[in-house]
Amino acid sequence: MSYDQIEVPDDGEKITVDEETGELSVPDNPIIPIIHGDGIGTDVGPAAQKVLDAAAEATGRSVSWMRVYAGSSARDKYDENLPEDTVSAIRNHRVAIKGPLTTPVGAGFRSLNVALRKKLDLYANVRPTYHLDGVPSPVKNPSAMDMVTFRENTEDVYAGIEWEAGTDEVQKVKEFVEEEMGADGVIHDGPVGIGIKPITEFGTKRLVREAIEYALENDRPSVTLVHKGNIMKFTEGAFRDWGYELAEEEFGDVTITEDELWEEYDGERPEDKVVVKDRIADNMLQQLLTRTADYDVIATMNLNGDYMSDAAGAQIGGLGIAPGANFGEGLCLAEPVHGSAPKYAGEDKVNPTAMILSGRLMFEYMGWKDAGKLIRDAVEKTISDGDVTYDLERQIEGGNKLATSEYADKVVENIKELA
């Protein structure tokens, strides 16, 4: 397939998906689209590429990078923020990585990141949260945190179905709710903004399916459904019920509930079973601190997932090192959690760890777990040796402050040493 402004490498092969099984077929020299991103993306993007190339080479593979464009780079080439070229290239090549994007005022949508996820139907936002030795943390035992959050990406109050106070539309909704749905007196008089919170069986089950499959493939002992169903019974309560239903329908032979764990197995989990349990969202935020090691894979809705993953990230050193990815049906778009920080753009000083570890998550999605392990080990060795960027150096006694590019070079050096 040809594109308007995108050059497809001659020396790589496409990742494909088996239509019957849904499994990826990944060559040893895949073409992977990359969006460097806005602001500090121009620094962390190339730094991550360098590290990912080294890990691929060390495990007998190579990556053929294909530059695609969104944000400021797309405006330069296409005079628009998110060209169809980019969406098509990612969809056709299945696996991609992007840096942070800034959504300009008047862009036509609230968020470039959200728009890209919606166009590709990337329904699961996946956030691994684990501590790297040497990274300062505000908690006493940060290494207890080793959790992966699956956050539903397309529904909930983030669906964007809302109406501004003072508009004709919001008045119609208010009247309908009060007069037709029997909620008279619930909404206070005066200006009001109203939003709708859709939670569907379809959206819930495909997210929980992804979370359980991840747990099974990665030897994770439990999946926890996080919800506020004690209050929002027909939305978040339905999420809980549909989650358990999916586990029983599709994974009944390899999952057990928490009740079954205690009633049938006296609290001892069989090695071939994943425990599916649920927690109320506010209690779960406490348990992240008080019972950290009890949780492995989290499956939750959009808003809860936003809170949960950021709170968990704080326990292991902050969002500057937090990786992420978005999964769809045979699609993966990896991205760091942090923003574009335009005031540091081009200064070669920011921490590229989140982008590097997002690439690690992408490699694992592709089945390159050996390369992924090498990246984590090399990053951890680099940081524990005190070779860090300015944000960590000021928190580490005796740290050696490195530029973005120098830090990437040091990680590459450690990859070669560890391989």
UniProtKB/Swiss-Prot annotation:
The gene is icd. GO terms for biological process: glyoxylate cycle; tricarboxylic acid cycle. It is an enzyme of class 1 (oxidoreductase). The record marks Y158, K228 as: Critical for catalysis. Binds 1 Mg(2+) or Mn(2+) ion per subunit. GO terms for molecular function: isocitrate dehydrogenase (NADP+) activity; magnesium ion binding; NAD binding. Mg(2+) binds at D306. Belongs to the isocitrate and isopropylmalate dehydrogenases family. This is Isocitrate dehydrogenase [NADP]. Its cofactor is Mg(2+); Mn(2+). InterPro entries: IsoCit/isopropylmalate_DH_CS (IPR019818), Isocitrate_DH_NADP_dimer_prok (IPR004439), IsoPropMal-DH-like_dom (IPR024084). SUPFAM superfamilies: Isocitrate/Isopropylmalate dehydrogenase-like (SSF53659).
